[in-house]
Amino acid sequence: ALADSGQNMKDGIDLAVEEINAAGGISGRPIQIVYGDTQGANATGMTEMERLITQDKVMAVMGAYQSGVTEVVSQVAENYQVPMITANATSDSLTSHGYEYFFRLAPTNMMFIRDMEQYLLDLSAKDPADDIDVKSVAVCADNTELGQQTATWAKYFAEENGLEFKGEVLYSQGAADLTSEVLQLKSLNPDALIVDNYVSDAI
């Protein structure tokens, strides 16, 4: 379910490395990329991180895509004092451990939800005569730490902004059928839906 997203990121990295190396690399030295595949699993991610550091002798690590996997592999990188940077994972807790070798580029989940709800408010206020008038929200997300954070922050900022929080529908990641969840969301009948899904689940 996550393979397509992983391949898209790999394609982008390969293109960037090709362009950087064609321009002389970094301080005259070419970049060499070694890939590890977490397969979306914490244990596999930890094994791959160990391999990259102890066998491939990488100087730094980028990743991972999922917040849960990033949480555990960042511990491995920290133990080996190897710099790690994530551009994707958004869980609030990732930078709460005081690690010296872990860095994030992506905003936290709290920031995303705060800005989503502010956008909905701005959209509603932009043209009072428009059909968009958001007074209530609900959440659809997978039942992980990240999804639970999404629901918590959505409710918090809804109350802060005077919006009615209609509820949350959390599902098992990678579920083959989300019909019942869709029906639950329909019954909640929010003016806007805040979703935090991986691509295959969102489709």
Kindly give the residue locations of the regions a language model identified:
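Residue-level signal for short, function-critical loop segments
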Residues: 1, 39, 141-144
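Beta-alpha junction/loop-to-helix N-cap segments that form part of ligand/metal-binding clefts
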Residues: 4-12, 19, 23-99, 105, ...
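Conserved hydrophobic residues forming the short capping helix/wall of the S-adenosyl-L-methionine
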Residues: 17-24, 124, 158
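Surface-exposed acidic, glycine-flexible loop patches that form ligand/cofactor-binding
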Residues: 23-26, 126-132, 187
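Residues that mark the start of a beta-strand
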Residues: 32, 135-136, 192
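Glycine-rich phosphate-binding loop signature in dinucleotide/nucleotide-binding domains
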Residues: 52-57, 131-132, 185-190
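Extracytoplasmic ligand/sensor domains, especially the bilobed periplasmic-binding protein
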Residues: 58-168
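Extracellular/periplasmic bilobed ligand-binding domains
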Residues: 151-203
